[in-house]
């Protein structure tokens, strides 16, 4: 069984990592590389979502979409955006 994360709970987890900077955190390492690096990760994952949608299983597609959401939220944390900032534009 896995623990279900929501958009909000993932954001809170990433924000906490950014604030507490646990040693060995991949999220912290990515944040330290800056927006350019994070933007490249979003582009990479968006391409993988497209490829998965064309050629892979639903399970693989779901995994790629989750990675795109993760990297998008890391950018949100880096820029100081909150989920509410996104929700008002949906």
Curated annotation (Swiss-Prot):
Pfam families from the UniProt entry: PRA-PH
This enzyme's EC code(s): 3.6.1.31
SUPFAM superfamilies: all-alpha NTP pyrophosphatases
Keyword vocabulary terms for this entry: Amino-acid biosynthesis, ATP-binding, Cytoplasm, Histidine biosynthesis, Hydrolase, Nucleotide-binding
Alphabetized GO MF terms: ATP binding; phosphoribosyl-ATP diphosphatase activity
Biological processes annotated in GO: L-histidine biosynthetic process
Subcellular location: Cytoplasm
InterPro entries: HisE (IPR008179), PRib-ATP_PPHydrolase-like (IPR021130)
Top-level enzyme category: hydrolase
Main location: cytoplasm
Presence of the UniProt keyword Hydrolase in the record: yes
Pathway(s) it belongs to: Amino-acid biosynthesis; L-histidine biosynthesis; L-histidine from 5-phospho-alpha-D-ribose 1-diphosphate: step 2/9
Reactions catalysed: 1-(5-phospho-beta-D-ribosyl)-ATP + H2O = 1-(5-phospho-beta-D-ribosyl)-5'-AMP + diphosphate + H(+)
KW Cytoplasm (keyword) present: yes
Coiled-coil boundaries: none
Recorded GO CC terms: cytoplasm
Domain of life: Bacteria
Family: Belongs to the PRA-PH family.
Listed NCBIfam families: histidine_hisI, PRK00400.1-1
Protein name (database record): Phosphoribosyl-ATP pyrophosphatase
Native source organism of the sequence: Corynebacterium glutamicum (strain R)
Chain's gene name: hisE
